[in-house]
Protein backbone atom coordinates (compact mmCIF):
# COMPACT_ATOMS: atom_id res chain seq x y z
CA UNK A 1 0.00 0.00 0.00
CA UNK A 2 2.92 2.34 0.57
CA UNK A 3 3.98 1.90 -3.08
CA UNK A 4 0.42 2.69 -4.20
CA UNK A 5 0.35 5.80 -2.00
CA UNK A 6 3.68 7.00 -3.44
CA UNK A 7 2.53 6.41 -7.03
CA UNK A 8 5.15 3.73 -7.70
CA UNK A 9 2.43 1.07 -8.13
CA UNK A 10 -1.13 1.07 -9.45
CA UNK A 11 -2.32 -1.72 -7.15
CA UNK A 12 -1.16 -4.00 -4.37
CA UNK A 13 -1.64 -7.73 -3.98
CA UNK A 14 -2.04 -8.86 -0.39
CA UNK A 15 -3.75 -11.43 1.74
CA UNK A 16 -1.84 -14.65 1.09
CA UNK A 17 -0.90 -14.81 4.77
CA UNK A 18 -3.26 -12.21 6.24
CA UNK A 19 -7.02 -11.94 6.56
CA UNK A 20 -9.16 -9.57 4.50
CA UNK A 21 -9.70 -7.56 7.69
CA UNK A 22 -5.93 -7.13 8.19
CA UNK A 23 -5.46 -6.03 4.58
CA UNK A 24 -8.39 -3.62 4.85
CA UNK A 25 -7.02 -2.07 8.06
CA UNK A 26 -3.63 -1.51 6.40
CA UNK A 27 -5.28 -0.04 3.30
CA UNK A 28 -7.40 2.35 5.34
CA UNK A 29 -4.42 3.43 7.45
CA UNK A 30 -2.07 4.07 4.52
CA UNK A 31 -4.47 5.09 1.73
CA UNK A 32 -7.69 6.18 3.44
CA UNK A 33 -11.08 6.35 1.78
CA UNK A 34 -11.26 7.92 -1.69
CA UNK A 35 -12.94 11.33 -1.87
CA UNK A 36 -16.66 11.04 -2.55
CA UNK A 37 -16.80 7.36 -1.60
CA UNK A 38 -19.11 6.60 1.28
CA UNK A 39 -17.92 3.10 2.10
CA UNK A 40 -15.00 0.84 1.22
CA UNK A 41 -16.25 -2.48 -0.14
CA UNK A 42 -15.05 -5.43 -2.17
CA UNK A 43 -15.90 -7.43 -5.22
CA UNK A 44 -14.81 -10.60 -6.91
CA UNK A 45 -14.08 -10.79 -10.60
CA UNK A 46 -15.58 -14.13 -11.61
CA UNK A 47 -14.56 -15.75 -14.87
CA UNK A 48 -17.39 -18.14 -15.61
CA UNK A 49 -16.90 -21.60 -17.11
CA UNK A 50 -17.80 -20.19 -20.56
CA UNK A 51 -15.04 -17.54 -20.22
CA UNK A 52 -17.37 -14.61 -19.54
CA UNK A 53 -16.16 -12.18 -16.85
CA UNK A 54 -18.66 -10.87 -14.33
CA UNK A 55 -18.30 -9.06 -11.01
CA UNK A 56 -19.93 -9.92 -7.69
CA UNK A 57 -20.14 -7.26 -4.97
CA UNK A 58 -19.86 -7.02 -1.99
CA UNK A 59 -18.49 -10.41 -0.99
CA UNK A 60 -16.01 -9.55 1.73
CA UNK A 61 -16.41 -6.27 3.64
CA UNK A 62 -19.82 -4.72 4.47
CA UNK A 63 -22.07 -7.17 6.39
CA UNK A 64 -25.42 -5.38 6.10
CA UNK A 65 -25.23 -2.25 3.93
CA UNK A 66 -27.90 0.41 4.20
CA UNK A 67 -29.54 1.85 1.08
CA UNK A 68 -26.85 4.45 0.43
CA UNK A 69 -24.00 2.02 1.10
CA UNK A 70 -25.57 -0.55 -1.23
CA UNK A 71 -25.78 2.09 -3.96
CA UNK A 72 -22.10 2.95 -3.40
CA UNK A 73 -21.17 -0.75 -3.59
CA UNK A 74 -23.02 -0.98 -6.91
CA UNK A 75 -21.21 2.04 -8.36
CA UNK A 76 -17.81 0.89 -7.10
CA UNK A 77 -18.30 -2.64 -8.43
CA UNK A 78 -19.39 -1.31 -11.82
CA UNK A 79 -16.26 0.85 -11.94
CA UNK A 80 -14.06 -2.11 -10.98
CA UNK A 81 -15.66 -4.26 -13.69
CA UNK A 82 -15.16 -1.49 -16.25
CA UNK A 83 -11.47 -1.17 -15.36
CA UNK A 84 -10.67 -4.88 -15.26
CA UNK A 85 -13.17 -6.82 -17.36
CA UNK A 86 -14.60 -4.18 -19.65
CA UNK A 87 -11.64 -4.13 -22.05
CA UNK A 88 -11.79 -7.92 -22.58
CA UNK A 89 -15.57 -7.86 -22.89
CA UNK A 90 -15.71 -5.47 -25.80
CA UNK A 91 -15.88 -2.34 -23.67
CA UNK A 92 -19.06 -0.47 -23.03
CA UNK A 93 -20.94 0.21 -19.85
CA UNK A 94 -21.63 -2.72 -17.55
CA UNK A 95 -25.18 -3.88 -16.91
CA UNK A 96 -25.71 -3.77 -13.14
CA UNK A 97 -28.22 -6.11 -11.49
CA UNK A 98 -29.39 -5.24 -7.98
CA UNK A 99 -30.22 -8.67 -6.59
CA UNK A 100 -33.01 -9.75 -4.28
CA UNK A 101 -35.24 -12.71 -3.58
CA UNK A 102 -37.89 -10.77 -5.52
CA UNK A 103 -38.10 -9.78 -9.17
CA UNK A 104 -40.10 -6.67 -10.04
CA UNK A 105 -42.61 -6.96 -7.21
CA UNK A 106 -42.92 -10.74 -6.96
CA UNK A 107 -42.53 -10.32 -3.18
CA UNK A 108 -42.96 -7.53 -0.66
CA UNK A 109 -40.59 -7.20 2.30
CA UNK A 110 -38.41 -4.49 3.88
CA UNK A 111 -35.32 -6.17 2.37
CA UNK A 112 -36.87 -5.89 -1.09
CA UNK A 113 -37.66 -2.23 -0.38
CA UNK A 114 -33.97 -1.67 0.46
CA UNK A 115 -32.86 -3.06 -2.91
CA UNK A 116 -35.48 -1.02 -4.78
CA UNK A 117 -34.40 2.17 -3.01
CA UNK A 118 -30.71 1.45 -3.66
CA UNK A 119 -31.46 0.83 -7.34
CA UNK A 120 -33.19 4.20 -7.60
CA UNK A 121 -30.29 5.88 -5.82
CA UNK A 122 -27.70 4.36 -8.18
CA UNK A 123 -29.76 5.51 -11.17
CA UNK A 124 -29.91 9.02 -9.69
CA UNK A 125 -26.25 9.23 -8.72
CA UNK A 126 -24.85 7.50 -11.79
CA UNK A 127 -26.99 8.10 -14.88
CA UNK A 128 -24.06 6.74 -16.93
CA UNK A 129 -24.72 3.23 -15.58
CA UNK A 130 -27.33 0.78 -16.82
CA UNK A 131 -28.85 -0.54 -13.59
CA UNK A 132 -32.02 -2.45 -12.77
CA UNK A 133 -33.55 -4.16 -9.76
CA UNK A 134 -34.87 -5.71 -7.86
CA UNK A 135 -33.97 -8.90 -9.74
CA UNK A 136 -33.57 -12.51 -8.70
CA UNK A 137 -30.29 -14.04 -9.83
CA UNK A 138 -31.88 -16.21 -12.53
CA UNK A 139 -33.71 -13.21 -13.99
CA UNK A 140 -30.47 -11.23 -14.04
CA UNK A 141 -28.43 -14.02 -15.64
CA UNK A 142 -30.62 -16.18 -17.90
CA UNK A 143 -32.25 -14.56 -20.98
CA UNK A 144 -35.18 -17.00 -21.12
CA UNK A 145 -35.99 -16.40 -17.44
CA UNK A 146 -35.60 -12.65 -17.90
CA UNK A 147 -38.10 -12.67 -20.76
CA UNK A 148 -40.74 -14.05 -18.40
CA UNK A 149 -39.86 -12.39 -15.08
CA UNK A 150 -38.57 -8.98 -16.23
CA UNK A 151 -39.56 -8.29 -19.84
CA UNK A 152 -38.22 -4.99 -21.09
CA UNK A 153 -35.45 -4.77 -18.50
CA UNK A 154 -32.21 -3.34 -19.91
CA UNK A 155 -30.23 -5.59 -17.54
CA UNK A 156 -32.20 -8.79 -17.00
CA UNK A 157 -30.69 -11.79 -18.74
CA UNK A 158 -27.51 -9.89 -19.61
CA UNK A 159 -26.02 -8.61 -16.33
CA UNK A 160 -22.26 -8.16 -15.99
CA UNK A 161 -22.28 -6.85 -12.42
CA UNK A 162 -24.25 -8.61 -9.69
CA UNK A 163 -24.80 -6.61 -6.50
CA UNK A 164 -25.87 -8.71 -3.53
CA UNK A 165 -28.02 -7.20 -0.77
CA UNK A 166 -25.71 -8.30 2.05
CA UNK A 167 -22.42 -10.00 2.81
CA UNK A 168 -24.05 -13.37 3.55
CA UNK A 169 -25.53 -13.69 0.07
CA UNK A 170 -22.49 -12.26 -1.75
CA UNK A 171 -19.94 -14.42 0.02
CA UNK A 172 -22.00 -17.59 -0.37
CA UNK A 173 -22.73 -16.85 -4.04
CA UNK A 174 -19.13 -16.38 -5.10
CA UNK A 175 -18.11 -19.63 -3.39
CA UNK A 176 -21.01 -21.58 -4.92
CA UNK A 177 -20.22 -20.14 -8.37
CA UNK A 178 -16.56 -21.08 -7.98
CA UNK A 179 -16.98 -24.54 -6.45
CA UNK A 180 -20.10 -25.85 -8.19
CA UNK A 181 -20.10 -23.70 -11.32
CA UNK A 182 -16.45 -24.10 -12.22
CA UNK A 183 -15.75 -20.36 -12.27
CA UNK A 184 -12.41 -18.79 -11.43
CA UNK A 185 -12.68 -16.26 -8.60
CA UNK A 186 -10.27 -13.32 -8.34
CA UNK A 187 -10.46 -11.30 -5.16
CA UNK A 188 -11.55 -9.93 -2.92
CA UNK A 189 -10.69 -6.73 -4.74
CA UNK A 190 -10.95 -3.79 -2.35
CA UNK A 191 -12.65 -0.74 -3.82
CA UNK A 192 -13.09 2.77 -2.52
CA UNK A 193 -9.59 3.28 -1.16
CA UNK A 194 -7.75 6.49 -2.09
CA UNK A 195 -4.99 5.17 -4.26
Give the positions of each predicted feature.
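Anion-binding alpha/beta catalytic cores of soluble intermediary-metabolism enzymes, centered on
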Residues: 1-156, 160-195
Amino acid sequence: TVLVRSGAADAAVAGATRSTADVLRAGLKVLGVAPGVEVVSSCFLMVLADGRPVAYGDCGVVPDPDVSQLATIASSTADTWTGLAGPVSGGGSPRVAMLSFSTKGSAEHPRVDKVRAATALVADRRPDLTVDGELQFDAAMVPSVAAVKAPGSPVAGAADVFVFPDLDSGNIAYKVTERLGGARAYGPLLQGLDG
